[in-house]
C-alpha cells in the first residue's frame, strides 16, 4: 500500500477556510482486504470453479504439493491483506469493522473527508453499499448530513455497462456534502438492465423520496431496489405507510 497524505500532496487544496476538493469522481476498488485460498488457486487453475467441494479441496492440495512457490506467494499475500485489514478497521472509517472490510467502504468515507463543504461526489458503487451492514454508518451519515442529487441503479447484464461481473447491480451516485433542507428528497432511478432501458429511463423523472421516508424504510438506512415501473413505486409508497410487522428484524422493510 502506497500511503498518501492529501494535505501534504495538495496543500493548495487543503489550506484555507474551505479545504477540500470541489469535485471528487471515482470508481473505487470492489474487493475485500482478504485473500481466499480457493479464489487464489482458481486464478492459477480456472477449472477449480467447476469442481465439487471435495474435488476442489483435493485439487488444491495437489497444486500446493506441486507448486511450493505459489504456496509461499499465497502466504505473503495473506500477510499483506491482514495488515491492510487492520489499517482499515483501525482507521477513520466508522462501521467498516462489521465483517471482512471492503475497500469501497473505506473509499466512501475518504471521498467524504476530502471533498469540500458543498462539494460534489460522483462515484460508482456496488449494490452492497446501499444495503450492507458494513456500509450502514456511512449511509446514515450521508443521508443525515448530505444531499443526494441522484442514485441510479443498473444491472450489468451481458456487461452492457462495465466490463466486469455481469451479475452485479451497480449504483451510480451523485452526492453533495451539503446539509439536507427541510424538504430535501433523494432521487432514485432504475435498475436498468440494458443501454436502451438506461437511455429511456434517464429521460423520465426519477422517483423522489423525502429524507424522512428514507430514514424510516429500515433501521439500517438501506435503499430499496424497485422495478422502474410507476405502479411498483406507487405500491411501495403505500406499503411504507403501513405499520411494521417487525422492527426488530435486521434489514426488514416497513411492510
Model-found features: residue ranges?
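Glycine-centered, small-residue-biased loops immediately flanking beta-strands
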Residues: 119
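Class I S-adenosyl-L-methionine
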Residues: 107, 131-138
Amino acid at each position: 500500500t502506497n500511503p498518501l497524505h492529501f494535505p501534504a500532496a495538495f496543500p493548495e487544496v487543503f489550506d484555507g477556510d474551505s479545504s477540500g476538493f470541489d469535485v471528487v469522481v471515482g470508481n473505487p476498488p470492489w474487493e475485500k482486504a482478504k485473500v481466499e485460498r480457493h479464489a487464489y488457486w482458481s486464478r492459477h487453475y480456472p477449472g477449480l470453479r467447476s469442481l465439487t467441494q471435495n474435488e476442489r479441496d483435493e485439487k488444491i492440495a495437489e497444486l500446493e504439493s506441486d507448486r511450493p512457490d505459489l504456496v509461499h506467494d499465497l502466504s505473503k499475500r495473506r500477510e499483506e491483506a491482514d495488515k491492510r485489514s487492520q489499517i482499515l478497521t483501525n482507521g477513520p472509517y466508522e462501521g467498516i469493522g462489521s465483517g471482512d472490510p471492503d475497500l469501497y467502504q473505506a473509499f466512501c468515507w475518504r471521498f467524504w473527508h476530502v471533498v469540500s463543504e458543498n462539494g460534489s461526489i460522483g462515484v460508482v458503487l456496488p449494490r452492497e453499499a446501499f444495503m450492507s451492514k458494513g456500509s450502514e454508518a456511512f449511509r446514515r451519515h450521508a443521508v443525515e448530513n448530505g444531499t443526494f442529487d441522484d442514485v441510479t441503479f443498473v444491472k450489468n447484464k451481458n456487461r452492457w455497462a462495465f466490463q466486469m461481473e455481469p451479475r452485479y447491480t451497480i449504483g451510480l451516485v451523485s452526492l453533495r456534502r451539503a446539509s439536507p433542507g427541510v424538504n430535501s428528497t433523494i432521487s432514485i432511478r432504475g435498475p436498468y438492465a440494458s443501454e436502451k432501458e438506461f437511455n429511456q429511463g434517464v429521460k423520465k423523472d426519477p422517483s423522489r423520496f423525502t429524507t424522512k421516508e428514507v430514514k424510516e424504510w429500515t433501521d439500517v438506512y438501506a435503499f430499496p431496489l424497485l422495478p422502474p415501473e410507476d405502479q411498483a413505486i406507487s405500491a411501495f409508497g403505500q406499503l411504507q405507510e403501513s405499520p411494521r410487522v417487525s422492527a426488530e428484524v435486521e434489514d426488514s422493510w416497513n411492510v
